[in-house]
Design a protein with these regions (language model features):
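NAD(P)-dependent Rossmann-like dehydrogenase/reductase catalytic/cofactor-binding core
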Residues: 2, 26, 174-184, 206-207, ...
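A non-catalytic, amphipathic alpha-helix used as a structural packing/dimerization or gating element
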Residues: 38-49, 97, 163-174, 214-217, ...
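NAD(P)+-binding Rossmann beta1-loop-alpha1 motif at the extreme N-terminus of oxidoreductases
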Residues: 1-50, 57
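Structural motif
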Residues: 10, 33, 75, 90, ...
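Rossmann-like NAD(P)-binding element
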Residues: 38, 42, 56-114, 121-122
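Rossmann-fold dinucleotide-binding core
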Residues: 117-184, 188-192
Length: 310
């Protein structure tokens, strides 16, 4: 596999733009591609705002931010993929759209260029069906917001070579991330864990055990603090496997096993209350509270990352 100097990212949304600044911050030349010029303009604004936050938090200097911004190019020209040493795609989460994209792009790049998708749960093996030389294709699942969260899931499809997976893994290390290698499965590992937690949280609220506010506080002031430092298997070892086995023996059968989204989540989807993105979800985000929540999230995530990992 070739050395990596220029990285081309497809999709200039929240994930793609944040990935672009992460690569550029770590010295890579980046081309951010999107079919919509307006998406590229929004990406520029978002990246600049993220840099202002990092300057304010003392993560980068003005000079470093300026240098990073100069490493990013923006384009709607698909021919730019011919210049890529590595490609990562972060376009809409629909299999047919990803198929159309990769069928074209995988035939534009050189045969030794490793290709990755940022899908959060679609099958790597199925996406690879339209990839020229699928052995060089794998998953590179970044976690929102990508410029702050350290974890990256490296997902191996049925045809992903060990060499390609290692290239993706090593690249994640180069940009100061914590990669983990997982095999292809619906939702991979992170989203299976995340959605299992969400299902039980919904079940708790629906059954009157606790309010949404109480559940959020339990995570923020209890489990969240614990899991920021220790994984669930480490927690079990420290607490005693006999203790956890005893609790599991009577509690597992009472936990939710719902097979479809239900109750308060389904109700909000029906009302088109999608969360911060349109002003209402489980909480209200009108009158500027949407921007406040995003700013709070990024500021607190940044502080936590500095405390935990530096």
């Amino acid at each position: 596999m070739r050395g990596i100097r220029r990285i081309v990212i497809a999709g200039a949304g929240t994930m793609g733009s944040s990935m672009a600044q992460t690569f550029a911050k770590n010295g890579y030349d980046v081309t951010l591609y999107d079919v919509f010029p307006t998406a590229l303009e929004k990406a520029k604004i978002l990246i600049e705002l993220n840099q202002k936050t990092e300057i304010a938090e003392g993560i980068v200097t003005d000079a470093q931010a300026k240098e990073m911004l100069e490493r990013i190019e923006y384009t709607t020209d698909v021919e730019e993929f011919r210049k890529a040493d590595f490609v990562v795609e972060a376009i809409v989460e629909k299999l047919e759209i990803k198929h159309s994209f990769w069928e074209k792009v995988s035939n534009l790049v050189e045969d030794d260029v490793v290709l990755a998708t940022n899908t959060s749960g679609l099958s790597i093996t199925k996406i690879a069906e339209k990839v020229n030389h699928p052995e060089r294709f794998g998953g590179m699942h970044w976690i929102n917001p990508p410029h702050i969260i350290r974890l990256i899931e490296v997902i191996k499809g049925e045809k992903t070579s060990e060499e390609a997976a290692q290239v993706i893994y090593n690249l994640a290390l180069e940009v100061e991330k914590k990669p983990v290698i997982v095999n292809d499965a619906l939702g991979f590992a992170l989203n299976r864990i995340q959605l299992a937690i969400l299902r039980e949280c919904l079940h708790i609220v629906e059954n009157g055990i606790a309010t949404p506010e109480a559940v959020d506080d339990i995570m923020k002031y209890g489990l969240g603090l614990r899991y920021a430092c220790l994984g669930p298997f480490e927690v079990c070892d420290l607490g005693g496997l006999d203790v956890f086995n005893n609790i599991a023996s009577y509690l597992f059968e009472d936990l939710s096993d719902a097979k479809k989204p239900f109750g308060m989540l389904a109700d909000r989807i029906e009302k088109e209350q999608f969360g911060v993105k349109n002003g209402a979800g489980f909480y209200d985000y009108s009158d500027g509270k949407d921007a406040e929540k995003i700013e709070y999230r990024d500021r607190m995530f940044t502080k936590l990352a500095k405390c935990l990992y530096e």
